[in-house]
Amino acid sequence: MYSQTHQGQHVMMNGGQAHQRFGMQIPKFQSQSHHPHHTQQPHHHTHHNQASHNINHQHNFSSGALASATPHFTPSHIQNGAHTNVDEDIDESMNEHWQQQLQLAAESRQASSPHYHARSVAQQAKGIQIAPSQPETQEQVPDGQNGVVKAKASSRQGWHALDFGGQGLRALSTSLFNYIFLEKLYLNHNKLKALPPAIGQLRKLNHLDLSGNDLTELPEEIGMLTNLKKLYLFDNNIRTLPYEMGYLYRLETLGVEGNPLNDVLKSHIMKEGTKALIKYLKEEMPAFFFSCTTPLTLMAVHLPPPDRDWIVLDETASSSNHRTDKVTVLSYNTLCDSSATQSHYGYAPARVLSWEFRRELILNELRSHDSDIICLQEIDQGSYNEYFREQLAYNDYKGVYWPRGRAMGMQEEDAKCVDGCATFFKGSKFILLDKQLINFGQTAVRRPDAKGQDDIYNRLWQKDHIAVVVFLENRQTGARFIVVNAHLYWDPAFKDVKLIQTAILMEELTKLSETYAKWPPCTDKAAFRFSKEEGQSETPPLEEPAPSMQYASGDQIPLLMCGDLNSSPGSAAYNLIAHGRLDEEHPDLEKRLYGNLSKVGMTHPFKLKSAYGAIGELPFTNYTPDFKDILDYIWYSSNSLHVSALLGEVDKDYLQRVPGFPNYHFPSDHIALLAEFTVKGKKGKVVEADFGPQRN
């Protein structure tokens, strides 16, 4: 063992006979699952910034020969840029960017001997005692936008790098790409003619050396390696680069000297360096897009994904012709304009982040699904009033909207930029009986037990997240629905706040539901119809509306609760909703004082299930290079509703080439959820409207 002057260990195994146990022939290899790292930002939305990677981690390099069959690979990337003459006035010897290229290329050529990098580290460590490693304690890493906490593994993989340099390799074993924990991979000075698309699986790589091979192109999947800081391609036969390299927004050094690179690409890196070339590839990335009316000249870099499958869970209910017995609900966090910045989403082209571009994609998606109810989060006031309310009115939608609490007291122009929750419903199908706003912070301080509870004022009251509640009645069947549209706080440092917000939401819904159970029957249920123009055929008469349903108690009313809860399955907020109670001593409360909620616990009377729980939840609802998890839900009261169909997951093959959203096909970092429900047998009784004494 050799000691180092800093924490952590750097040990490289060069693949010699003395280290055969580290070879690739490992019969039962299990890689550890490492959760993505997020830098916390002082904003309610996810900031996908990457902090500088800590260098004090372990590196053991294991190399052994990889004798295997040639992997299946069909290059398909698009050649970009036309050949033009590079500015002859550039003095390569004086340009700092190209000077660095020449220096790094020279160093690369000196590293052609077998296992050069492993041997170099071994020589540096010779005679130095390495302190035994200690298991790392579990550290929680927050998602900067959505507040989901991902726990690091309690122990780390013992090695994070492989050196296969100078081995004369002509092909790579597919087993190599199962080592998803790798951070450094040296494949330099071999005889590789192609890099398998499976390279995209090694998403933790920050250093990849492919110098001195016979590569003529790179696969599109290279764009999945968004943690790359160094990519060395010296001395190959590469003429062009895939546009997907534009996703490599953290790349600091791209080595291309010794390649017949086309003049356009070479000019960018010579004049302005790696960052400029990556930005060029990102911003010039074509897209295949045909449903947007924005006048763009677009071509295909890869086809859009197949439509998400419509998963039918109950064929009898889903195929029923009685549409009034069913209700479809869509929930979507649209990523508000103020949060969609290059600093948060550096992998996305500027025009993809443009609100004018994204809002049209969102509108088209909403129209294509044509759901009965739409719940949108992160819609600012300006977008609701000036775009979505007007546009969706053409599709028979009426809307209810509230901004977050910070909009109060702002100037009108400033308030337009504050996001909130918007709920739309089909006006021809539903009657709006009531609407309510739940401001979690303001509701908390009005509680009788809030006096003397400092945490309510210091932690909860300062957060202005909200829920919008609408009470609807189906014009034809008389069935009533409570529809909730909520957006919870994201920051994992305030997990107690997120839990208390959930508890307050359920407490307020309990009160509202009891009020709605006593709501009088609706007397005028006829939908507005335009006058028939001359010569226009008669429209078929509507069925006679059924009388309003009455419910014995609030928990009997069908309840649909949608939103971005910023909570993964198994979290405290999730468990409270799903199980109806949570102990007062739950660790997420951290012994803080929140009145009776932290003294006697939290409960609610509803029997709620996650709609997507019927299929074990989706793989994710939020997708970025550093974070992939379930944050969004459609909850339903299982005693009064039955889920009959769901919108499925995003195509897995498509995701092999797309490191994160938003992009040309997905306008938000969240995806839309869509579920179809059927109303179960009536628990209440039918009540005829009382019109008073009638004359004969």
Curated annotation (Swiss-Prot):
It comes from the Eukaryota. Residues 34-50 have a biased composition (Basic residues). LRR repeats lie at residues 181-202, 204-225, 227-248, 250-271. Disulfide bonds: none annotated. Keywords: Activator, Cytoplasm, Exonuclease, Hydrolase, Leucine-rich repeat, Magnesium, Metal-binding, Nuclease, Nucleus, Repeat, Repressor, RNA-binding, Transcription, Transcription regulation. One of its GO terms (cellular component) is Cdc73/Paf1 complex. Residues 96-113 have a biased composition (Polar residues). Pfam families: Exo_endo_phos, LRR_14. InterPro entries: CCR4/nocturin_mRNA_transcr (IPR050410), Endo/exonu/phosph_ase_sf (IPR036691), Endo/exonuclease/phosphatase (IPR005135), Leu-rich_rpt (IPR001611), Leu-rich_rpt_typical-subtyp (IPR003591), LRR_dom_sf (IPR032675), LRR_R13L4/SHOC2-like (IPR055414). This is CCR4-Not complex 3'-5'-exoribonuclease subunit Ccr4. It comes from Aspergillus fumigatus (strain ATCC MYA-4609 / CBS 101355 / FGSC A1100 / Af293) (Neosartorya fumigata). The gene is ccr4.
